[in-house]
Amino acid sequence: MVENMETSFKSIDLIQIMDKWQRKWDESKIFETKHDNREKFFISAAFPYLNGVLHAGHLRTFTIPETIARYQRMKNKNVLWTFGFHVTGTPILGLANQIKEKKEDIIWAYTNLHNIPMDELLKLDTPEAIVECFSKKATDAFKKMGFSLDWRRNFKTDDKVFSKFIEWQFYKLKDLGLIKKGSHPVRYCPKCENPVEDHDLLHGEESTTVEYNLIKFTSTFDEKDVIIPMATLRPETVFGVTNAWVNPDEIYVLAEVYDEIQKLDSEDVDLKYNGLWIVGKECADKLKEQDKNIKILKEFKGSELIGLKIKNPVTNLKVPIFPAEFVEMNIGTGCVMSVPAHAPYDYVALRDLEKVEEVGLISLIEIEGYGKYPAKEIVEKMNIKNQKDEALLEEATSKIYKDEFHKGKLNENCPEYKGTSVKDIKEKLIKDYMNFGISEIMYEFSEPKVVCRCGEKCIIKTVKGQWFITYSDENWKRLAHECIDSMEFAPENLRHEFHNKIDWMKDKACARRKGLGTKLPFDTNWMIESLSDSTIYMAYYTIARFINAGINENQLTSELFEYVFSGNGNLAEISNVSEVSIEIIEEMRKEFLYFYPLDWRCSAKDLIPNHLSFMIFNHVALFKKEHWPRGIEINGYVTIEGKKLSKSKGPVLPVLEVSETFGADVARFYITTCAELPQDADVKFKEMEKARDNLIKLYELAVLVTKEGIIEKELSIIDKWLLHKTHSSINFAEKAYEEFHLRKIGLMFYELINDLRWYKRRGGDNNGVLKEVVEIWTKLLSPVTPHLCEEIWELLGHNGFISKEIFPNVKIEYINEELELGEEFIRFTMEDIRNIKNVAKINPEKMYLYTADDWKYELLEFMNKNSEKNVKELIPIVMKEERFKRHGKDVMKLINDLMKVGVKKAIAEVEILENAKTFIEKEFECNVIIGGEDFNGKKKFAIPYKPAIYME
């Protein structure tokens, strides 16, 4: 009856099925929701940015919560699942300008990768046109994928009504003292004249701002007293400086340096003289943007500095400057401290110059496992010959720095700090150096290439009069840590990473001079930037349907939001001023209180250090503890046939293209089951085709079941086995959905396909059983492949939507582990028979199967009762039993053998083999005898679950 499952129904049109059920869902509005008496479930994903089409990365990140939302509905929960669209900031402005200028790379990317026809693309020369175009395409993509969203709650972040919500948020943060104004170093685009965030960048999205210490060495140059600052991330190493390095072929400058001191309550500055500095020309350009006024007096090559003696401000030692071509001018000042006792690069460079004896080595850190001069020691141990051995030098440096940080302590050459561990000294030294006036701060990017979407290279700029959110506030961090401790994480190991991100969080610029979005309500010259207006919008989802039904921005006062989200204020007065009825405001508050807190927030891992961490910060500041988020799910990235996604270079794989090519269900099934959460998912089109073929098999079985009808008959062993396997799957599937282990759903489905093949081989042909299997699996798969499952559900004669059905319950009477072990035993026995046949190269006429002696089953039972013991612990206990002891060495061998095959429950092997005798005979075309005469003493080799086999 299931033979036809091995062929595909080529006539099945998954696209047609997809369109049919999307239309029915849309007409019935079954995914619209409001507060009621059921248990609620609120899940959301980071909304997409509308500067392109939704792609494969979006597909994975969004399909995971979509699947969980459908599952939770089947658990009879009231599910809130919806989407907004992010348009804040400058990327859309930049894209409009690039299209207007007909930039070749942009035109190519959007016509070839985003599939925008040329005539349509050239019309997208305004931000408004781009937002309209891509919001429609995103909506179409969500609908084409069958997302079960409540569309009444959709919004864009430049909607005037949403801006009023953000104004409330920022007024409240300011009232709490969490927004301040001052000078602040930010990533900055000189062309856009704006701070830039991760979403604004073409390259360097994960770059951070790194704080370097400039140690102010002094000397005399051109008969003038000069400061030669040297950048370091390790201020303790100043104690071990023996010389300095400059690049002889690069350009340096002698410049008057003035500190820019911002006047109180003003963006104007006073200038304070800071001396004559010698730095690289590129460094001077950077310092101009970081609170320094630079007046260049002279440009010269680094070779003029060679041999100059400079004074170490910490040790007062005078050390020479040597030439080094390895000095990079794009990082730091172009002048580098040399610490050869602890830096392999410095030691090898000095050795190449034959200067080691001249300057000597100064030890400053004691490390367990190393001698006095770790760099010299590791260079000699790794046989590093010269500076060209870059890979080895990098490895040596990494190892020493790691060991010094974790295990090192400062020695007697650091008098006041002797005995302090390296990992604990940095902040104290920075503070001390600053107090002594011998150190300053300079900022660099953590990555060499940071480029704005407009194509301009970004810089770090100290913006004056900048508004920033004080994420460095220790009390605020304490609340954020408390929230993280109370949350669930999928996967769980993310908890530690979030704690780390909170610890390292610094103040963040929250506004810029231009862009789309919301004006800063208390300083309208500034626009709130994109990572600051996207932290609590999940709360807005809860009330968006009321606002979208006809409330305008003038009615949305901060007092109204304060009442809805905090319960503060006089309701009658708020209603009177806003002209929103008391009834509506009360409904808004009820809806918020019902659906909040957010149960799960879903995103890809790139948002951990920014959006997701900011979400936690803002929730703990603005909402009561009972409304803090409960869970965060993070997935890995997506590649296409091994290639990294790129909006500008490709591949992209638009979501609409996937749905039109494979159908939504195939795409949904594949993208959610091809990899575990933290792993990156690689989309392989051949595998998607295989997934499609296997899904069609379930439909084929449903067709065959309905065609042939149901004939009542007694359940056979193999019928009971299939029912056991199917009902066992219910618990496994439930656990997988609850824990976001969606890959397991796919593996279970593929196991079902194999189970059905085995059922057929074993002679299974009970239509009633097969129908029950199809019905259960249609429900189990419905959250992942809803269109196909709706079609099968209808085919099986059911009314209504499977999307609104209750998740199946396990029928305990069908659960029988012995049946599963029995079929597994038969399958493995047949594999052993096949292997023996192949090795011996015979086709037997008779085959004898010998099961194990009774004492071996007794030992198996004994091992089951002591399953927590390992082999070493088990053997002494077993040998105390006389019934086992008399079998001597055979016992120890059997214990090891049973451990290898897996310690399982003892089963009635003789009875199972007798029941399967006809099946085995048919498979191998020979007579099978269970037991019988012991030929060649074979029986003694039988162990539980592994019969001995004799063929003739």
Swiss-Prot record:
Residues that bind ATP: 647
Alphabetized GO MF terms: aminoacyl-tRNA deacylase activity; ATP binding; leucine-tRNA ligase activity
Motif ('KMSKS' region): 644-648
Listed GO CC annotations: cytoplasm
Xref: Pfam families: Anticodon_1, tRNA-synt_1
Record field: catalytic activity: tRNA(Leu) + L-leucine + ATP = L-leucyl-tRNA(Leu) + AMP + diphosphate
Subcellular location field: Cytoplasm
One GO term (biological process): leucyl-tRNA aminoacylation
NCBIfam families named among the record's database cross-references: leuS_arch, PRK12300.1
Family (UniProt): Belongs to the class-I aminoacyl-tRNA synthetase family.
Protein name per its UniProtKB record: Leucine--tRNA ligase
Organism: Methanococcus vannielii (strain ATCC 35089 / DSM 1224 / JCM 13029 / OCM 148 / SB)
